Design a protein with these regions (language model features):
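N-terminal cap/lid subdomain of alpha/beta-hydrolase-fold enzymes
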Residues: 45, 49-110
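Conserved acidic catalytic loop of the alpha/beta-hydrolase fold
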Residues: 122-142
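Conserved hydrolase catalytic core segment
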Residues: 139-179
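Alpha/beta-hydrolase-fold enzymes
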Residues: 164-239
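Short beta-strand/loop motif that positions the catalytic acidic residue
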Residues: 275, 281-283
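Conserved alpha/beta-hydrolase "acid-adjacent" motif
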Residues: 288-294
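Catalytic histidine neighborhood in serine/cysteine hydrolases
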Residues: 292, 299-314
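Catalytic histidine-centered segment of alpha/beta-hydrolase-like enzymes
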Residues: 312-323
Length: 337
């Protein structure tokens, strides 16, 4: 029987060495955060952690935003000499995206319900830019490195603040959603609402089944025996039920609005032409959760470095090919900051 690893362990690209010490969670108070929609998040707060040492020229900072439903605490596993971001070389800023239950979210507001303002991926990036410039005193980054929804934020960084960083790495992210992606996220929202309009945690079990179905490929799921499958379902439900239902829904709404080509009239080529940073785009050919085609097209349009992984692990293929991804990212980042 194969051991089914929890999502956090599979998705992380941590090295085989000892786990790095957990840096303290910090909070930046941004006051009012005006969103693209015109709505405002009052008492806007962003959670973050830092690791490593900022060099004398302040040129070695690397921003790592969270993936969907992830936290900065979970990102710590990517740090260290054998991790995705080597904190003996870089000053890592791990940032909690809006809606993850640490930064401003429906669950952290005075009224944790559907009255919380709807935000976008670009709004996530806007709050991160304010964190860096207003609270950490950084006017540039060496790199932005993001996985999954973090990879979507990486694409948004490329076009919203094209000259702010030297390098960008998007891993299983996308510049805009395909119809397949939209069907998935809309199905989760509708299952959530249809099962229980009030959004209780019990409704999340229906969401868990849809989510788990798309994390892997049919080929991968077919290799599970009955015990593997029970463990897989139990671990998926444990992960999802631990997350606030409204936070889950609001981050989905942000992804459904994600399209970095929108400010460029929907033109992918115009959006790609605006990118100034060097870029590395990592995709999984058999990703059923984030369709890799837009990322590949965008990468070709901006002549970015590309790594395509062919693995039945699907969206979690970066975990199954962790050594390849770590080596490629480390080499890409290694230019002296």
């Amino acid at each position: 029987m194969r051991r089914i690893l929890p999502l956090a362990l599979v998705l992380l690209l941590a090295g085989a060495g000892p786990a790095p010490a957990q840096p303290a969670l910090q909070t930046a108070d941004l006051g009012r955060c005006r969103l693209e929609s015109g709505a405002v998040i009052q008492d806007c707060r962003i959670g973050y952690r830092t690791a490593g040492t900022l060099n004398a020229t302040r040129s070695n900072a690397v921003l790592v935003p969270t993936w969907f439903s992830g936290t900065s605490g979970a990102l710590v596993g990517q740090l260290g000499p054998e991790g995705l971001v080597d904190t003996t070389r870089y000053f890592a800023v791990l940032v909690d995206a809006l809606g993850n239950g640490v930064s401003s979210s429906p669950s952290t507001s005075a009224r944790p319900d559907s009255t919380f303002p709807v935000f976008s991926v670009r709004d996530m990036v806007a709050t991160q830019h304010r964190l860096l410039t207003e609270h950490l005193g950084l006017d540039s980054l060496h790199a932005v490195v993001g996985l999954s929804m973090g990879g979507m934020q990486a694409f948004a960084w490329m076009t919203r603040h094209p000259s702010f960083m030297d390098k960008v790495v998007s891993i299983t992210g996308t510049p805009r959603l395909t119809p397949q992606d939209r069907l998935l996220w809309r199905a989760e929202l509708r299952a959530f609402r249809a099962t229980d309009p009030n959004g209780t945690r019990a409704a999340m079990k229906a969401v868990s089944a849809i989510h788990g179905l798309h994390l892997h490929t049919p080929e991968h799921l077919a290799t599970m025996d009955s015990t593997d499958f029970r463990d897989f379902v139990a671990q998926r439900e444990e992960h999802i039920l631990a997350f606030d239902p409204h936070d889950w829904a609001w981050q989905i709404k942000a992804m459904l609005r994600h399209d970095v080509t929108a400010p460029f009239g929907g033109s992918l080529s115009r959006a790609a032409a605006a990118v100034e940073a060097d870029a590395l785009v990592v995709t999984v050919t058999q990703d059923h959760m984030v369709n890799p085609r837009p990322a590949r097209r965008f990468a070709r349009a901006m002549d970015a470095e590309r790594l395509a992984l062919d693995t039945p692990c699907g969206h979690l293929g970066t975990g199954c090919k962790a050594d390849t991804v770590r080596t490629t990212v480390a080499h890409f980042l290694r230019d002296d900051p």
